[in-house]
Structure formats: structure tokens, C-alpha cells
């Protein structure tokens, strides 16, 4: 029986030894976690998001305030976000003039502002940056709205949106910037908006809000070269100019913006009614993808690294997308309602967002850090902050 007793004792001793070994290992593991956290990568740990830091430069942005007839110059830097000065614009002292669109010249010497209201036509104004001194202005069509400028600064393209008139085809005004002369008025579609040129300056795109289409203008001929139907399930590219109007009851997209990609190979169109974005291939003139967006997606802007910033007019928010996949990378709430425009700084660090507000609310300018995808600053502006463009860095 002795061998059996010895065997039992040996077994118990081995068990006790295994227990001690396990306890020592557990203790060592605990010490490692407590005092050397970088030595072991825990499966559930995620890298921390980068924290926003104060800007090392000053960024200056112009914003037009539609109900206040004001142009605001805003500075964002290490001291925060503040309004540098405001300038009144318009000819009618007793009525709202309604500045809506704005574009800064490539040489940063001038800004061009579309003014929607007139008697009856609206106008576009040329001012000198910094002083905001008026150089000259010229009359255009009914409610000139979104404005863009050619890469060489020679022409501005203004969408005559005709927001308050009859539902009839309107136009894009082409204005020579040196003498502020309208050289061509190109009939496109009903309620054009979202006037944007491709980076090469060879094609102009605008959204046709009441025709569910996007129009393309060849800037060499100043004629409509193609159009693209955007209705859900009816997406189709066509050549030439459109020859008929849509019925109001048939509208499913109601596009408000057409934004070319950084290389001009794609155009992204915001469908304000259906809350999605349509990506169109410029070469084949076919739809590449259609992806969900925020409530009332309105204006679009490209970051320098190819992300797409979208303002959600009804959704009181701003979305950032990977437009190649349609994945929403972030959705940021805004301080006030009726989110309007977006512009990205040349160094790709920040996006500035204009918010109109409702009723007696002031307008707002908000700043998004594009590295952290967080809102880092806000400032009140005069009522109905609308179009905006970047001026310069200091």
C-alpha cells in the first residue's frame, strides 16, 4: 500500500505546484498590465482619436448673410473665431437685397457676390478683398444664386435660380470679370442651383431643382453639352440640351448641388428630396453609385484628400463621406437649424460651415477639424448666413 500512498502524495504535490505556477503567472500578467501597458496589445483596445489643437495660422473666410444684406469677413486662428468686419451690399434701401452666392478670385484680389432680389432682376457685384470696396456690378436674371469662378479668374458662372418665379427654364449667366459684362446667358433648366466648374475649367455643372437633372456646359462654346436624369430608378445620361420639363409630381431627387471630384472624373449630386447622393462618371456619363445621405442634403464640398463634406439642411447636421464607397465617416450636429454651405481650407485642416438659422436666430459659422472630425469653433453672424468662400491664410 505504500506505493499507492507515495503516488497520491506525488500527485497532490504536482497539483499544488501547478496551482502555484498558475498564480505566479497570473500575478506576473497583472503586474505587466499595471506597470507596462505598452508591452501587451490588448485585443479590445483602440487607438485614441487625435485631439484638436489650436491652429497655428489664421484663416480668413467671406460669408454672405442673405436676410441682413451683409458680407462678413471672419477670422479663425489661435485666438479663436471672430468677425473681422461686415459690409452692406445691395441697391434697395427699404427691401431685402438677398446676397446668396460668393466666389473669391484665384489671385485673392477680388470677391464676386450674387444678389438675388431686384426690380425684378438680380445682380452680381465685384468688390476688392480686404477693404470690400465695390468695383462695379451688373444686372443678371431672376434671383442669381450660386456662383463659381474659372481657374484663370476670367469668368464667373452664376445660376439664375428664379426661386420665386414661374416654373419655367432659367439660365446660367457667364460674366467677364474684368469689365463685369455678361457675355452669355445659357438656358439650362428649371431652377438651376449649385454652380460648379471642374478643376480644369472646361466643364460647368449645375443642378436643376425642378427638373430632377444635372446640366453640363462646355465652357469653350458656352452651350449645354449634356444632361443627366437623376430620378430614382431612372438615372440616365443624355447628350445635348434638355427638351422638356419635369412635372412637379414626378420629382423624386430635387437636386441642389453638383460637385466635381478633385480630378474632375466624377460629379457628385445632392438629392435634397430623396436624401441621397448620386455619383456620375464623367467619361461614360453613367451613374457609378447612389448612396444614402443626411436629411435634406443640400451643399457639397470636396476635401483635398477626396472626402466629401455634405450639409444636411433639414437634418441640422454636417456629414463627411468617403464618396468612393458611400460610407459616412462622421455626422456632426450644428448649433442651429437650416445648414447651408461648406468650404474647405487649402491646407485641408478645416471645413467652414454656414448655417442660416430660423426666425429671429442669427446666422452661424461653424468650423470642423478635418483631422479629428469634430466641431471646434462657432460664431454668430447676421441673419441667414448662406454662401461662403475661402480668402486666404496668414
Where are these predicted regions, by residue range?
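Predominantly soluble domains enriched in secretory-pathway, periplasmic, or organellar proteins
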Residues: 38-394
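Alpha-helical transmembrane segments
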Residues: 21-28, 147
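Alpha-helical and His/Cys-centered functional microenvironments
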Residues: 16-19, 27, 197
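Bacterial N-terminal signal peptides
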Residues: 25-37
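N-terminal secretory signal peptides that target proteins for export/translocation
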Residues: 1-20
Amino acid at each position: 500500500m505504500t506505493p499507492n500512498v507515495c503516488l497520491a502524495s506525488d500527485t497532490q504535490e504536482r497539483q499544488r505546484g501547478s496551482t502555484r505556477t498558475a498564480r505566479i503567472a497570473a500575478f506576473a500578467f497583472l503586474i505587466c498590465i499595471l506597470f507596462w501597458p505598452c508591452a501587451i496589445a490588448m485585443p479590445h483596445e483602440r487607438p485614441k482619436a487625435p485631439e484638436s489643437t489650436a491652429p497655428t495660422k489664421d484663416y480668413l473666410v467671406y460669408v454672405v448673410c442673405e436676410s441682413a444684406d451683409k458680407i462678413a469677413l471672419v477670422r479663425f486662428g489661435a485666438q479663436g473665431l471672430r468677425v473681422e468686419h461686415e459690409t452692406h451690399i445691395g441697391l434697395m434701401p427699404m427691401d431685402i437685397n438677398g446676397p446668396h452666392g460668393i466666389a473669391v478670385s484665384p489671385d485673392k484680389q477680388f470677391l464676386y457676390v450674387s444678389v438675388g432680389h431686384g426690380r425684378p432682376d438680380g445682380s452680381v457685384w465685384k468688390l476688392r478683398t480686404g477693404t470690400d470696396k465695390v468695383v462695379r456690378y451688373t444686372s443678371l436674371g431672376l434671383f442669381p444664386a450660386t456662383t463659381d469662378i474659372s481657374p484663370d479668374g476670367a469668368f464667373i458662372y452664376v445660376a439664375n435660380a428664379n426661386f420665386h418665379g414661374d416654373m419655367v427654364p432659367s439660365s446660367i449667366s457667364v460674366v467677364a470679370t474684368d469689365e463685369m459684362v455678361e457675355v452669355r446667358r445659357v438656358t439650362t433648366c428649371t431652377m438651376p442651383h449649385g454652380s460648379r466648374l471642374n478643376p480644369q475649367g472646361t466643364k460647368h455643372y449645375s443642378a436643376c431643382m425642378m427638373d430632377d437633372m444635372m446640366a453640363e456646359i462646355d465652357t469653350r462654346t458656352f452651350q449645354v453639352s449634356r444632361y443627366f436624369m437623376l430620378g430614382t430608378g431612372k438615372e440616365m445620361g443624355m447628350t445635348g440640351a434638355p427638351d422638356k420639363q419635369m412635372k412637379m409630381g414626378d420629382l423624386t431627387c430635387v437636386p441642389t448641388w453638383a460637385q466635381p471630384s478633385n480630378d474632375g472624373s466624377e460629379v457628385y449630386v445632392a438629392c435634397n428630396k430623396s436624401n441621397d447622393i448620386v455619383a456620375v462618371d464623367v467619361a461614360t456619363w453613367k451613374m457609378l453609385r447612389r448612396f444614402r445621405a443626411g436629411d435634406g442634403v443640400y451643399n457639397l464640398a470636396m476635401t483635398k484628400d477626396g472626402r466629401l463634406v455634405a450639409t444636411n439642411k433639414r437634418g441640422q447636421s454636417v456629414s463627411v463621406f468617403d464618396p468612393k464607397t458611400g460610407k459616412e465617416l462622421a455626422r456632426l450636429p450644428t448649433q442651429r437649424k437650416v445648414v447651408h454651405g461648406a468650404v474647405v481650407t487649402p491646407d485641408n485642416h478645416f471645413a467652414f460651415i454656414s448655417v442660416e438659422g430660423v426666425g429671429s436666430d442669427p446666422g452661424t459659422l461653424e468650423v470642423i477639424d478635418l483631422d479629428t472630425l469634430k466641431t471646434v469653433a462657432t460664431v454668430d453672424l447676421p441673419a441667414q448666413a448662406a454662401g461662403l468662400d475661402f480668402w486666404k491664410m496668414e
